[in-house]
């Protein structure tokens, strides 16, 4: 199998220079995996659409490029003596070479082919010597490494077969563990003994789940069993590393399947998920238990690239307080009074524990706390809510509300239409720049003072009264009208 996506990259010039110096050089790791996925998708598209005009998938751009070589770090430095070389991981055989775009031009490239906008920027490329890892004393890094001249020995130390593939500058693969076949079959499989791989670095447990979620893969049975056996290792992994993998996991296309199947594994780092599984809601409005309901909401919630993490987490956690607030009435119907506030508290505990950034934590908790907000097709009510929460938060709460209702399993089409119409109303308010906040008001504090109001708290009270009247459409948002109102009402 030949991978054109890599053989056409400018970084092949790095491999050429290593080869000219008498060394081997290969692309390795994620860039090879993504290039194979891209190549397979294009092949499938050509089969579906003769002439190769089908839509390209996957959409990911291959950016990070890692290179492995039999050259020792000092030899790599000598080969690239005319470049900037950083000792980014010299203990483990890694140096980073910084290239200018024009330095990656091959001899066959005309000078004008170089993108002039990129000539001032530097492209970092990690180059690592083939190695065999020693014992992992800290569950993250090998205590020692032994350099080797064998590419296969280097690939054997890697986590999963899909990441244990090398590609030369002509696009030809070296794939001793069947990684390309696993990519095609959508299987995540550990290289060698899965338990050993996970005990070397416990974060690989989260990485397995993340790759399966992102790539839409099943986890090979032996690897899957090892996940459960070794799950306790996650307790010793830093919160920041866990959180980074969790964010990638929940935004994956198969995140729901992974959360369902590996709740016990994720429960090591988020134990609050465990009571949700199998917790019957005993309510005719809900068809599923609490966890299944939340997972379904996570699967269907609409997101953007800039809010996907906290929206997916909000959907997954929005009812996490239900087990704690459950009660039954005299008819045996389940109720969860106050669960949004409890869910918000639990969310904050989780995000604090995972050392999440403040913006994500606060936005997530705000959405969860108010996910039961009542929405009506009332422009004035919507503007009041938009004033209180902000337009962006309101649109996100609406999306969570829509996903929440869909995930009951009993959502009627009329309710979906209602939510869509409410969204259109809010977007119209924004598009028409209708006034719903003090910053939109046609008058400000200086105008109120100019109208004769003494500086102080009364200025704020007047502005809030005017805003309320404008939102309720008792007054137009016109400066002359509002100034007259100040003069007559005060």
What is each residue range found by the language model?
Residues 1-490:
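Catalytic cores of the polymerase beta-like nucleotidyltransferase superfamily
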């Amino acid at each position: 199998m030949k991978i054109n996506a890599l053989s056409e990259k400018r970084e092949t010039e790095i491999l050429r220079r290593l080869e000219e110096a008498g060394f081997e050089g290969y692309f390795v790791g994620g860039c090879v995996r993504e290039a194979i996925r891209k190549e397979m998708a294009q092949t499938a598209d050509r089969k579906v659409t003769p002439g190769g005009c089908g839509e390209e998938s996957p959409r990911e751009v291959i950016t990070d490029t890692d290179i492995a070589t039999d050259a020792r770090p000092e030899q790599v430095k000598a080969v690239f003596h005319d470049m900037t070389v950083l000792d980014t991981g010299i203990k483990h055989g890694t140096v980073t070479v910084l290239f200018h775009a024009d330095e990656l031009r091959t001899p066959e490239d005309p000078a004008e082919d170089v993108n002039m906008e990129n000539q001032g920027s530097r492209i970092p490329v990690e180059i690592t010597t083939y190695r065999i890892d020693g014992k992992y004393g800290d569950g993250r890094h090998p205590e020692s490494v032994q350099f080797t001249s064998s590419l296969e020995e280097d690939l054997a130390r890697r986590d999963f077969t899909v990441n244990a593939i090398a590609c030369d500058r002509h696009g030809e693969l070296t794939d001793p563990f069947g990684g390309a076949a696993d990519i095609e079959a959508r299987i995540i499989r550990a290289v060698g003994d899965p338990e050993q791989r996970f005990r070397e670095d416990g974060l690989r447990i989260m990485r397995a789940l993340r790759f399966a979620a992102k790539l839409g893969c099943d986890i090979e049975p032996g690897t899957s069993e090892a996940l459960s056996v070794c799950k306790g290792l996650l307790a010793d992994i830093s919160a920041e590393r866990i959180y980074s993998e969790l964010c990638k996991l929940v935004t994956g296309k198969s995140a729901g399947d992974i959360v369902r199947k590996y709740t016990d594994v994720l429960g090591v780092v988020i134990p609050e998920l465990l009571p949700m599984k199998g917790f019957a809601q005993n309510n005719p409005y809900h068809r599923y238990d609490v966890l299944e309901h939340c997972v379904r909401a996570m699967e269907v919630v609409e997101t953007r690239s800039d809010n996907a993490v906290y929206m997916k987490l909000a959907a997954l956690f929005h009812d996490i307080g239900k087990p704690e607030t459950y009660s039954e009435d005299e008819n045996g119907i389940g109720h969860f009074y106050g669960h949004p506030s409890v869910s918000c508290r639990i969310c904050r505990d989780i995000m604090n524990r995972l050392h999440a950034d403040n913006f994500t934590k606060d936005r997530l908790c705000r959405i969860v706390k108010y996910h039961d907000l009542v929405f009506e097709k009332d422009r004035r009510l919507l503007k009041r809510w938009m004033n209180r929460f902000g337009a962006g938060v309101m649109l996100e709460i609406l999306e969570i509300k829509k996903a929440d209702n869909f995930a009951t399993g009993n959502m009627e089409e009329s309710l979906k239409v209602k939510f869509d119409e409410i969204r259109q109303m809010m977007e119209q308010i924004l598009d028409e720049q209708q006034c719903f906040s003090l910053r939109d008001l046609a008058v400000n504090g200086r105008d109120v003072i100019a109208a004769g109001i003494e500086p102080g708290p009364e200025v704020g009270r007047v502005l809030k009264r005017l805003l309320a009247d404008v939102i309720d459409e008792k007054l137009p948002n016109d400066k002359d009208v509002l100034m007259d109102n100040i003069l007559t009402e005060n």
